[in-house]
């Protein structure tokens, strides 16, 4: 492995956490749009899998804190998750904001000249599956992009699976 110097680092120094910090509902397209309106070019988002293996944006293993749904994210197919309101918990201005897939976010990021730190946030027991699925989705979405997304995780197992699935994508272990 070669050393990366600051001059080699392709990412901005400032990253908008979960899209726009507390200014919009976290991990939504509204958050990314809000962050971009303040001039941010890079966003950190959390990615996990639905019950049917779709990579989506969500921090928590359960739905209650940031949606009008109940239960575990990985117990629901994405079609059911897509119907949930992920904006009203923040404010009425964001009512009806949905849970986006990683693919949809990738298209927005690339169309808006932005960059992404994808934190792989696996539901316990799905570390390898989540790491591999997120990496493969990222590889496909960014195949022609100049700057790939940064894959990060607190899970060494998820990052190992991401490395095996898409070794060309940069990774970072969070501590």
Task: Please provide the spans of the model-predicted regions.
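Phosphate-group recognition and catalysis centered on beta-loop-alpha active-site segments
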Residues: 1-175
């Amino acid at each position: 492995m070669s050393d990366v110097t600051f001059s080699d680092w392709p990412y901005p120094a400032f990253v908008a956490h979960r899209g726009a910090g507390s200014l919009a509902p976290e991990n939504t397209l509204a958050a990314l749009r809000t962050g971009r309106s303040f001039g941010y070019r890079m966003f950190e988002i959390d990615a996990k899998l639905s019950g049917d293996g779709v990579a989506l944006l969500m921090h928590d293993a359960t739905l209650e804190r940031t949606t009008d749904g109940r239960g575990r994210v990985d117990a629901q197919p994405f079609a059911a998750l897509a119907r949930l309101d992920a904006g009203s918990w923040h404010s009425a201005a964001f009512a009806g904001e949905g849970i986006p897939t990683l693919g949809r976010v990738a298209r927005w990021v690339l169309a808006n000249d932005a960059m992404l730190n994808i934190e792989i946030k696996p539901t316990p027991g799905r570390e390898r599956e989540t790491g591999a699925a997120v990496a493969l989705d990222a590889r496909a979405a960014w195949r022609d992009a100049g700057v790939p997304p940064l894959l990060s995780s607190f899970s060494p197992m998820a990052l190992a699976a991401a490395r095996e699935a898409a070794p060309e994508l940069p990774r970072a272990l969070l501590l």
